[in-house]
């Protein structure tokens, strides 16, 4: 197995973006929604840069992450990217990239239980926000 601690933050984010999106899509379909346009609209509440940055900031404020997880978040956040989200400022985009980097790291290191714990927390948090 590869030493994923050495992997570039953007490579971790590349994987994390896909993994998080799959979990969110699975969750939304499990709610019984089948219309693609509605699913896409619902997914943006979870997967947009703004949503991911907000979730990441809440995790950090709640001291939910281990020291190692924070390092992986910072690796993605601080990575030099030449692309930016269309609908987010640079800071929001970088925090979201850090979020995706953490998800990618947990997946690649086969920490499925921890990955699912954090994703389930994110789903619950977004649900609470949408109820307000």
UniProtKB/Swiss-Prot annotation:
One BP annotation, GO: rRNA processing
Cofactor: Mg(2+)
Active site (catalytic residues): 17
Keyword rRNA-binding (UniProt): yes
EC number: 3.1.26.-
Keywords of this entry: Cytoplasm, Endonuclease, Hydrolase, Magnesium, Nuclease, Ribosome biogenesis, RNA-binding, rRNA processing, rRNA-binding
Subcellular location: Cytoplasm
Subunit structure: Homodimer.
Protein name in UniProt: Mini-ribonuclease 3
Gene: mrnC
């Amino acid at each position: 197995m590869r030493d994923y601690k050495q992997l570039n933050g953007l490579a971790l984010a590349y994987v994390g973006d896909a993994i998080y999106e799959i979990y969110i899509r699975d969750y939304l379909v499990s709610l019984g929604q089948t219309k693609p346009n509605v699913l896409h609209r619902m997914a943006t509440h979870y997967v947009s840069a703004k949503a991911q940055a907000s979730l990441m900031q809440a995790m950090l404020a709640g001291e939910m992450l281990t020291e190692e997880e924070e390092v992986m978040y910072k690796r993605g956040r601080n990575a030099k990217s030449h692309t930016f989200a269309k609908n987010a400022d640079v800071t929001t985009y970088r925090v979201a990239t850090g979020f995706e980097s953490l998800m990618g790291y947990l997946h690649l290191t086969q920490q499925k239980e921890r990955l699912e714990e954090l994703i389930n927390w994110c789903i619950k948090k977004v649900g609470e926000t949408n109820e307000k």
